[in-house]
Amino acid sequence: MSAPEPKITPELVASHGLKPDEYQRILDLIGREPSFTELGIFSAMWNEHCSYKSSRIHLRGLPTKAPWVLQGPGENAGVIDIGDNQAVVFKMESHNHPSYIEPYQGATTGVGGILRDVFTMGARPIACLNALSFGAPEHPKTRHLVSGVVAGVGGYGNSFGVPTVGGQTRFHTRYDGNILVNAMAVGLADADKIFLAAASGVGMPIVYLGSKTGRDGMGGATMASAEFGEGSEEKRPTVQVGDPFAEKLLLEACLEIMANDCVIAIQDMGAAGLTCSAVEMGAKGDLGVDLDLDAVPTRETGMTAYEMMLSESQERMLMVLKPEKEKEAEAIFRKWGLDFAVVGYTTPTKRFVVKHGGKAMADLPIKELGDEAPLYDRPWVESPKLPVIHAREVNAPNSIADALEKLLATPDLCSKRWVWEQYDHVIGGNTLQRPGGDAAVVRVQDGPKGLALTVDVTPRYCEADPFEGGKQAVAEAWRNITAVGGKPLAITDNLNFGNPERPEIMGQFVGCLKGIAEACIAFDFPVVSGNVSLYNETSGRGILPTPSIGGVGLLDDFTKSATLAFKAEGEAILLIGETHGWLGQSVYLRDICGREEGAPPPVDLACEKRHGDVVRGMIHAGTATAVHDLSDGGLLVALAEMALAGSIGASLEAPPDGIVPHAWWFGEDQGRYLVTVKEDDLLTVLSKMKSVGVSCEQIGRTAGHTLKIEGERALDLKALRHAHEHWLPDYMGGKN
C-alpha cells in the first residue's frame, strides 16, 4: 500500500516552486485539489528547467533550419547531416546548481546526462566539451569548487570512455555564489537511424531500463529553477549520484536494442526523472500513458509514488517497445546486467495515470503537463548603452613586454593545462587536435572526415552590451571552427542568466538572443539544440549573462587542417582583419588597469564571414602554415600563444603610425586572424587579399626563441611559458 499523502496547503504549494496563480491554474485545469503526487508532477513539469516558461517565446526567434539539419530543437539533441548517411548528434546542457552544492557529483551527473541525451538518439558519443565558470580565485570556496568539478568531469568521461577534447574555464567574482558547469556531448549516428521521443500506437509496452530508482536527486529540477539563498548547502540531497560504468552498459545495451529494431520511442530520465520522460513521450505522440509504479525497480524500501515519480537517479531510460520484440529486448538488457521492467502502456486517453499499490495516485491531462505548460512574456528593459572608451583614455603600461608577461599569468588567460590534463582527451584514438587550440578536431572513423568542435562566450561583453555579446559568442565559435579549417554547420546553446522576474535580467536574455539569432542567420549557422538555465543568483546577486555557444563544423579532409603552432622559422606573420585598438571591456583594461568599463567591440558580421571564408580557403589550399583567431587579450597574447605552441619565437614590427601601442597589441577588435605563410607564398597571398578586399598586413616573422617587439625588450619563451603555465597549478596547490 502507498503511504498516506500530506494535506495540500499554501506553504506546501510554495515549497514546490509554484506561484499562487499557477496553483489556481492547476485547480481550474483539473477541477479539484491535486493529490500530493500530482502536485509534485505539476511542480516538476511546470518549473523553469523543464517548461522553459520564461524563455520559449524568445527562443522562437532563433534560426533552426538548414538543408543539413535533420532534427532541430525539441528532441533530446540536435542532428545534422554530414553526408554518406552519417549524422552528428549534439547538445549542451547545464548542471549549475548541483555542481555548486556538491561539485564532484554535480559535474559527473552533468556529463552523464548530456551523454544520455546523445545516445538516446541512436548515436555513439565520440567527444565531450565543457564551459566552466568559477568565482574569484580569492573567494574561499573557489579552489574547492574547481577541484571537485574538474575531477567530476574527468572522472565520468574517463570512466565512460569518451574523450573530453575542449572547452573554456573562467573566473569572475559574479560567479562566487553560482558557478556554471555547461557540458556538451557529440556523437555519430546513421542518418537514417535516428530515434525520437514521441510514442506511437495504443497499447504499446513502456519499459523501464537501466539502474534502479532511489531517493537521490529528489526535486533537482525544481531546485534548478530557483535562485539560491542562505542555506543552499542543505540542498545536497537533491544532487544526483552518477555511475559512469552503469552508463557505459546502458549505452551498449541501448545501441544493441536499437540495432535490433525493437524501439518505437525512447527518452532518457533526466530532470524530473520518470515524470518528465513519460509525459514527454506521451504528449509528443498525442497519447496517454498509464504507469504502474509497483513494477519500477527500486533500490530503497518503502518509496512512495511521489518519490518514485520525482527521483532523478541516474543511468535510466524509458522506452516504448514493439510488442513482438519484448523478449528479445529483455534478453539484451539482462545480458548487460541492467534492469528491464514493463512499467506501463500507451493509451488513447491523452491522460497521465499513475498507480501505486493498486491505487490511482495521479490522473492528469498529459498535453497540459507537457506541451501546454504555462508561458510567460515577462517584462524586460533594454540594457543601457555604455560609452566607447578611446585608447588614449586608457593608461599605457610601463612596458608592453611586462604587460604581456602579467596577462599570460592571469586567471582567464593562463594555460588551462592543469584542467585538461585531468581529462582523457585521446581515448578512442580519434582526437586529431587536442585541447589548447582554437577548436578540437575529432576524426570521423572509417574515412577522411573530421569534426571541428568548440565552446565559446565572452560574458563581460554580454553584460556590457547583450546584443553585441550574443553576436560575438556565435562569431567566435564560427572563427574557432574556421581557424582549424572546418566549415561551420550548426550550434547548440546553453543560456545561463539570473532571475528572469527582474526586467533588467530578462532584457539581457532578450538582447543576447537577438544577437545570437542575427549572427546565426548571417553565417547560415543554425541552432539545433540547447538549454536555458535561469535563476543563477544567490541572495539577489546574479551571474554575468553567459550564453555559451557550442559549435560543430566539418572538415571533408582532416589532413587539410591548421593548428595555432608556429611551424618553422623564417615564415611571414600576417594579421588579417582591421585593428582599431578597441580596449573597452578588454582583458588589458580589466587586469592591467583595474577597470571593467565601456562598450565591448562591435561585431561586423559581413566582415567576419568574408575574413573567415578567405582564411579557410588558405588552409584548404595549403598556404597557411599556422592559424589563430584573435580574442581575449588581443594581438600580442595570440602571438605568444602561437609561439609557445610551436616553441618558435618571433620578431615583430612596431605598431603603425596613428595607433596607440598598447591598443594595437592588446585591443580586442573582432573578426581577426593571425596566419603564417612561407616566404615563397607571401606576395601571392598579399595580392589575393587585396583583390578580395580583405585587410591583411605583415607584422613580423617567426624567428629564434624569443618574442622581440621593435623598441621593447625581448621576451624569452621559457620565461613566458613559466608565466603562462604556472598560475593555475600554483593556485590549486595553494601557492598563490
Swiss-Prot record:
Localization of this protein: Cytoplasm
Metabolic or biological pathway, per its Swiss-Prot or TrEMBL entry: Purine metabolism; IMP biosynthesis via de novo pathway; 5-amino-1-(5-phospho-D-ribosyl)imidazole from N(2)-formyl-N(1)-(5-phospho-D-ribosyl)glycinamide: step 1/2
GO CC terms in record: cytoplasm
UniProt function note: Part of the phosphoribosylformylglycinamidine synthase complex involved in the purines biosynthetic pathway. Catalyzes the ATP-dependent conversion of formylglycinamide ribonucleotide (FGAR) and glutamine to yield formylglycinamidine ribonucleotide (FGAM) and glutamate. The FGAM synthase complex is composed of three subunits. PurQ produces an ammonia molecule by converting glutamine to glutamate. PurL transfers the ammonia molecule to FGAR to form FGAM in an ATP-dependent manner.
Binding site residues for Mg(2+) 2: D117, D268
Residues holding ATP: Y52, K91, D493, G530
Keywords: ATP-binding, Cytoplasm, Ligase, Magnesium, Metal-binding, Nucleotide-binding, Purine biosynthesis
Ranges in a coiled coil: none
Annotated GO biological process: 'de novo' IMP biosynthetic process
Protein known as: Phosphoribosylformylglycinamidine synthase subunit PurL
Molecular-function GO terms, alphabetical: ATP binding; magnesium ion binding; phosphoribosylformylglycinamidine synthase activity
Residues engaged in binding Mg(2+) 1: E93, N531
EC number: 6.3.5.3
Segments crossing the lipid bilayer: none
Broad enzyme group: ligase
Family: Belongs to the FGAMS family.
Binding site for substrate: S94, H95, N96, H97, R116, Q240, E312, S313, Q314, S533
Reactions the enzyme catalyzes: N(2)-formyl-N(1)-(5-phospho-beta-D-ribosyl)glycinamide + L-glutamine + ATP + H2O = 2-formamido-N(1)-(5-O-phospho-beta-D-ribosyl)acetamidine + L-glutamate + ADP + phosphate + H(+)
Subunit relationships: Monomer. Part of the FGAM synthase complex composed of 1 PurL, 1 PurQ and 2 PurS subunits.
Active site: residue positions: H49, H95
Native species: Rhodopseudomonas palustris (strain BisB5)
